[in-house]
Amino acid sequence: MTSGAGWEEQVFLPITNSISSEDNNQIKIGSSVSIEYNQNGQHVSQIDDKGLHNILVLTGYAIDESTGELVPTFDPCDYVKGILISGKILKGNHFKIIGIPSNKLYIIRKKDVHGNITFSLPIKNFNTGTYQVDLRDKVTSFVSLDRDVAKTIVDNVLAKIYAKIYNSLNKEQKDKLYRDVEEIFNYYSIKSLKSNP
């Protein structure tokens, strides 16, 4: 944490089937979102020898897996889980939340989170200055990560974001991290009921 006042600016990185690592400290989500992370930054979400901590759950949202953008559904049962990392959104629209008290966020596996947090969300497109979401002919569905996807996310994404800590983990601790990702991360995906959305 920085100077007791709050965290440096964070980005919400949804952990989904459509996430992949790029060169130059970048993560790609679907076709429309690219996030640059600060490898030496102070991430709200952390890993250690006991696993993954400070996972943010955004309720009332689903993810468009083709684009990687979050879509507000206004359904309290829909949610997307992800991590808060030091970085910025390079490609895609974003919505910035400034200085929200950490105790107002739905954070699971909480560890050492205090103060205010400013973060950005990769969100569905804006139209001419007005935020508009068309939920007609759309349906959300529950998605969980399988073991192979969880392993790929740990090896190709988390291992790069948290390189110093990850490289110090032994095999048993890395196996725990694989299990954490597989068991913790699930989400709702939004799709069109029409064949050509």
Swiss-Prot record:
One of its GO terms (cellular component) is cytoplasm. InterPro entries: Cmr7A, CRISPR_Cmr7_comp. It is found in: Cytoplasm. Possible homodimer. Part of the CMR ribonucleoprotein complex, consisting of crRNA plus Cmr1/Cmr2/Cmr3/Cmr4/Cmr5/Cmr6 at 1:1 and possibly 3 Cmr7 dimers. A Cmr2/Cmr3/Cmr7 subcomplex without crRNA can also be isolated. It does not cleave target RNA. Keywords: Antiviral defense, Cytoplasm. CRISPR (clustered regularly interspaced short palindromic repeat) is an adaptive immune system that provides protection against mobile genetic elements (viruses, transposable elements and conjugative plasmids). CRISPR clusters contain spacers, sequences complementary to antecedent mobile elements, and target invading nucleic acids. CRISPR clusters are transcribed and processed into CRISPR RNA (crRNA). The CMR complex degrades RNA complementary to the crRNA (target RNA) within UA dinucleotides, generating 3'-OH and 5'-phosphate ends. It holds the Pfam family Cmr7A. Disulfide bonds: none annotated. Belongs to the CRISPR system Cmr7 family. This is CRISPR system CMR subunit Cmr7 1. GO terms for biological process: CRISPR-cas system; defense response to virus. The lineage of its organism: Archaea, Thermoproteota, Thermoprotei, Sulfolobales, Sulfolobaceae. Gene3D superfamilies: 2.60.120.1670. Its main location: cytoplasm.
